């Protein structure tokens, strides 16, 4: 098929001069910088023209529509995402079938009956009331829930939401009361009767008038008396309206921690609790101590986990008396991470840290009320080791009311859970159903623990555990018509990275009837390799669809740069070592071909965000190896990423181009700056982005595809396409219909490029 790509305006007068350690001053041209102006009529017209070209390729037939319909049919089953108990109330997230967004429900815990033999799902959920339904706010699913924070009693809930996929959040508040507290007008009487019929102990939900705007990556925590809450936000950007949130490219600076008192209408009334104007790029996280006597504030200067730690021990007094908050620096030299876990009445405070422990450990610090705090840079704090570092990664620590620690570890990218007492004595392992991923939900206020477990071929199942006996019981499992986990296989292999021979883990999933030895199986491989994030197993009905429809193989390459093996593994794929990520991924492809799983003509790869950068880099470096590439919301311009929205925080992984040493690394792999100019070979590629992505702004993809089409559009016959989704952002919270349309287009792209005939 011949492609008539749009004639994108190229301005060769735009350039920057960078300082290079290797070459002195270097001039780098940036002819498509005008595409960074997302709101310009020229850019909008260009987007429409590019989308038209992409649709002309995808819509040669109705394959996308057929795939979308089939996947939607497979998704037509009841599924539960999470359960959280507060007081006597149980909140849970449920999608009854194919709604764009999950609904949040509420029920009294006493109305749930759990099977004593642990072999069948709990019952009583039909009595739950609808607490929050995002689908009522937008028909197309572009209103999405970002955070959901329940107070200790369960009587109040703060939730934040976003629109059109933007990272900007707004905060709203709901209150839960009994129907006896409702005022007795006609409508309320009808509501009371309806609730009685549902036999739901007469809970009712009241919307409070509080509304807070211009939050991003916010950390919300309720105060002790539930009269207000802590959160953090940025100043409102100067040149953007509420309707255009997510389309601006301004750098996000001057994050502050605020206190909001219930009843105050909006953020203009809120009190600043903590700020650091001399370090405007810092972002803050907050956590109240177990007894709410202290507020801990973590200050992050970038995306590294290492942070400073501050404590306010007079928080309640300062709120009650409207006096000043006394901020004390506990950690002030970014030497490690210190995540607060809990504390005892005797003043022993527990923290998860990587201090002298790249795989992490649990320590405690003694903080007495009458003891002044001297920061660690000036006085060596006395750390007591509770759980020593092991040779596998400590991921998280939770506690229950029984004063036990439930410690989640990751060993070779498989989750295990161990139980310890507060002295660090090992008690037992929690026996999980098998290899896979487990997420644990517990609080110190009750004995109930919920564990979600899944892997690539097993749907997410929720288990319940009483911390008095730590017995794992089935709580809720999905029923997917026609699906059996036993029909599929998932195995883990280890291969050598081609240059330095580092062993890299990789998951391979396929249907047992698939021939994985002929070297001809259609293969869909993905990876991430960044920001200390581990790419763990999770179940996806869409991936199962690929295994079935393509008779194919799905692969996760756990390349360096992630958190799979702790700090050293992350650093081995960051900054000057970033090339290791690309080499590892290239090595994964070579392994699959060498071991006769697939061949170059049947290999499709996909990655998003930092994984989108991975796709751009490997396409430039090994265009002969990959037949089909899909890059979602990728970071493609490595010389300018730090100048837009939250990009300045990514320098922890990438470095920055105004540093001569970093420039010499970035210029060698930046996808935008390394498009081959004289090649007659390049993978079929489709970039996917959203016009409201304010994390990795769409200009990264706009500029990269423009350069590809300019340099190679008339030299190669492979498609060089971009799919720009309207009213979409970086991906989080995307509605089911948008997700489905996107994956249908991607699988359609796979089938056409890999020459796989799909039978419908």
Curated annotation (Swiss-Prot):
Coiled coil: none
GO cellular component entries: cytosol
Keywords carried by this UniProt record: Cytoplasm, Hydrolase, Protease, Serine protease
TM regions (residue ranges): none
Record's subcellular location: Cytoplasm
A Pfam entry, by short name: Peptidase_S9
Protein EC: 3.4.21.26
Active site per database record: 609, 693, 730
GO BP terms, alphabetized: proteolysis; regulation of gene expression; regulation of signal transduction; response to lithium ion
Null mutant phenotype: Resistance to lithium due to elevation of inositol (1,4,5) trisphosphate.
Top-rank taxon, per record: Eukaryota
Activity control note: Inhibited by chymostatin, Boc-Glu(NHO-Bz)-Pyrrolidide, Z-Pro-L-prolinal dimethyacetal and the peptide H-H-L-P-P-P-V-OH.
Reactions catalysed: Hydrolysis of Pro-|-Xaa >> Ala-|-Xaa in oligopeptides
Gene Ontology MF terms: oligopeptidase activity; serine-type endopeptidase activity
Record carries keyword Zinc-finger: no
Enzyme class name: hydrolase
Described purpose of this protein according to its UniProt entry: Cleaves peptide bonds on the C-terminal side of prolyl residues within peptides that are up to approximately 30 amino acids long.
Family of the protein in this entry: Belongs to the peptidase S9A family.
Name of the protein described by the UniProt record: Prolyl endopeptidase
Natural source organism: Dictyostelium discoideum
């Amino acid at each position: 098929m011949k492609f008539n790509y749009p004639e994108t305006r190229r301005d060769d007068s735009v350039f920057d001069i960078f300082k290079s350690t290797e070459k002195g001053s270097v001039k780098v041209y940036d002819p498509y910088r005008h595409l960074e102006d997302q709101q310009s009529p020229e850019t909008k017209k260009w987007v429409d023209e590019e989308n038209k070209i992409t649709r002309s390729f995808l819509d040669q037939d109705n394959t996308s529509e057929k795939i979308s319909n089939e996947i939607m049919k497979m998704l037509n089953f009841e599924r539960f995402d999470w359960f959280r108990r507060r007081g006597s109330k149980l909140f849970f997230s449920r999608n009854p079938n194919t709604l764009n967004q999950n609904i949040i429900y509420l029920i009294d815990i006493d109305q749930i009956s759990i099977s004593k033999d642990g072999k069948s799902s709990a019952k009583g959920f039909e009595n739950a009331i609808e607490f929050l339904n995002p689908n009522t706010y937008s028909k197309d699913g572009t209103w999405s829930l970002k955070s959901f924070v329940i107070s200790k009693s369960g009587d109040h809930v703060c939730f934040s939401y976003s629109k059109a996929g933007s990272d900007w959040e707004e905060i709203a508040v709901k209150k839960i009361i009994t129907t006896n507290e409702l005022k007795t007008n006609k409508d309320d009487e009808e509501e009371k009767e309806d609730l009685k019929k549902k036999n739901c102990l007469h809970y009712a939900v009241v919307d409070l008038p509080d509304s807070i705007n211009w939050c991003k990556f916010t950390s919300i925590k309720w105060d002790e008396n539930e009269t207000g809450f802590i959160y953090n936000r940025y100043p409102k950007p100067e040149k953007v309206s509420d309707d255009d949130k997510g389309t601006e490219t301004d750098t996000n600076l001057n994050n502050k921690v605020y206190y909001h008192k219930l009843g105050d209408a909006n953020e203009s009334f809120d009190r600043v609790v903590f700020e650091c104007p001399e370090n405007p790029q810092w972002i803050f996280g907050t956590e109240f101590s177990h007894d709410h006597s202290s507020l801990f504030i973590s200050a992050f200067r970038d995306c590294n986990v290492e942070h400073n730690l501050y404590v306010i021990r007079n928080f309640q007094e300062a709120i009650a008396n409207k006096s000043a908050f006394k901020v004390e620096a506990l950690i002030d030299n970014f030497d490690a991470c210190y995540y607060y876990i809990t504390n005892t009445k005797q003043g022993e405070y527990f923290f998860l840290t990587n201090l002298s422990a790249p795989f992490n450990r649990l320590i405690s610090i003694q903080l007495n009320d009458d003891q002044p705090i001297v920061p660690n840079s000036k006085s060596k704090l006395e750390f007591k080791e509770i759980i020593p570092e092991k040779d596998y990664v400590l991921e998280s620590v939770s506690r229950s009311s029984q004063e036990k620690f439930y410690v989640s570890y990751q060993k070779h990218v498989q989750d295990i859970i161990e139980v310890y007492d507060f002295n660090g004595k090992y008690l037992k392992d929690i026996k999980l159903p098998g290899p896979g991923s487990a997420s644990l939900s517990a609080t110190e206020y009750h004995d109930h623990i919920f564990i979600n477990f899944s892997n690539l071929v097993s749907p997410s199942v929720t288990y319940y555990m009483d911390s008095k006996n730590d017995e794992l019981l089935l709580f809720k499992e999905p029923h997917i018509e026609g699906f059996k986990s036993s029909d599929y296989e998932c195995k883990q292999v280890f291969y050598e990275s081609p240059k330095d021979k580092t062993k890299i883990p990789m998951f391979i999933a396929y249907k047992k009837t698939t021939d994985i030895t002929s070297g001809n199986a259609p293969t869909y491989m993905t990876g991430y390799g960044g920001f200390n994030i581990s790419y763990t197993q999770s179940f996806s009905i869409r991936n199962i669809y690929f295994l079935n429809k393509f008779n194919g193989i799905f692969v996760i390459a756990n390349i360096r740069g992630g958190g799979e093996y702790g700090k050293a593994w992350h650093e081995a794929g960051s900054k000057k070592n970033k090339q290791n990520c690309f080499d590892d991924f290239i090595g994964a492809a070579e392994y699959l071909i060498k071991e006769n799983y697939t061949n170059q003509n049947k290999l499709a790869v996909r990655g998003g965000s930092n994984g989108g950068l991975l796709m751009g880099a490997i396409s430039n470096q090994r265009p002969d190896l990959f037949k089909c590439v899909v890059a979602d919301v990728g970071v493609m311009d490595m010389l300018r990423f730090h100048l837009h929205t939250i990009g300045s925080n990514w320098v922890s992984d990438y470095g920055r181009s105004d540093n001569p040493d970093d420039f010499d690394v970035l210029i060698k792999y930046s996808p935008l700056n390394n498009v081959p100019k004289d090649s007659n070979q390049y993978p079929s590629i489709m970039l996917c982005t959203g016009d409201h992505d304010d994390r990795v702004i769409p200009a990264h993809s706009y500029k990269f595809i423009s350069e590809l089409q300019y340099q190679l559009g008339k030299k190669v016959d492979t498609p060089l396409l971009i799919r720009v989704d309207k009213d979409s952002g970086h991906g989080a919270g995307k509605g089911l219909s948008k997700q489905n349309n996107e994956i249908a287009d991607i699988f359609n792209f796979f089938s056409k490029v890999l020459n796989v005939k799909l039978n419908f």
